[in-house]
Amino acid sequence: MAAITAALIKQVREETGAGMMDVKKALTEADGDVARAKEIIRAKGIQAAGKREGRKAQEGTIASTVIDSAAGQTGYAVELNSETDFVAKTPKFIDFADTVLADAVKAGADDIDAVLAAPSQDGTVKEAVEEASALFGEHVKVGQFAKIEGPKVEIYAHKKSVEMPPSIVAMIATDEAGAAVAHEAALQISAMGAQWLTRDDVPEDVVETERRVATEKSLAEGKPEKIVPKIVEGRLNAFFKENVLLEQAYVKDPSKTIGDLFKEVGGQALAFARLEVGKAPEADA
């Protein structure tokens, strides 16, 4: 039997990210053959990954990029989740997030399903993520994905602390003139979390729910029925100002709205997206 040296263990650990005992067992089973040991770790790891899927993965990072495209520019952002911030801030995890992003861009993915189905090395992104769960020893998953297009796309990536990778990414697509204030708009999206670009983008069922709640609240407060409609409209406008990007007060100068910024440069905001780690609809999975 070949000697299992510290150098061999170190080599396999660096190449796989697996724990010391897992590496030692794999090398022993493989009789010191590094390639075979890596195969064993991969095979056993994928089996272990299935057991991890029920564990919560709400930490992680967001990888993002802008590329030139037929539309002018296209912005991509992918959230990769782990269970702990300890794993999320490791160079290997951050590099893997960048790899998933690159695979998504190369495949021209439009949604998470397309990201997971995208080719990646010897298989798909889905398979690579399963292997990553084994290598990092945690449940790893693709949490969110966003893609926007326009003549110009601006991205702002926010870090909660200098040692952590980005936890919020804001992307905004504008026309050429609007690019002059796109960075400020992206900062606003990151900080204030707008949900829609214009009030026309707010789904009718959401508006009706807000209208109903505002009406019931006004009546419960004992407001005279004849002035309730006016109060309701005021509360609806407040809802729009809080949740519609172009109607939000500019955080650096509340006397202006984000819409005013674009008017000042004669530009337009066309679309935006905001991803925050752990905030996917299925983030509790």
From Swiss-Prot:
Superkingdom of source:
Bacteria
One of the entry's Gene Ontology molecular-function terms is: translation elongation factor activity
GO CC terms: cytoplasm
Where is it localised? Cytoplasm
UniProt xrefs under SUPFAM superfamilies: Elongation factor Ts (EF-Ts), dimerisation domain, UBA-like
The UniProt keywords, alphabetically, are: Cytoplasm, Elongation factor, Protein biosynthesis
- Map out region (Involved in Mg(2+) ion dislocation from EF-Tu) in residue numbers: 84-87
Q: Do you know which Pfam families this protein is assigned to? A: EF_TS
Query: Its function?
Result: Associates with the EF-Tu.GDP complex and induces the exchange of GDP to GTP. It remains bound to the aminoacyl-tRNA.EF-Tu.GTP complex up to the GTP hydrolysis stage on the ribosome.
Q: NCBIfam families recorded for this chain?
A: tsf
| Entry's family note | Belongs to the EF-Ts family.
Q: What is this protein called?
A: Elongation factor Ts
The taxonomic lineage of its organism, from the top, reads: Bacteria, Bacillati, Actinomycetota, Actinomycetes, Bifidobacteriales
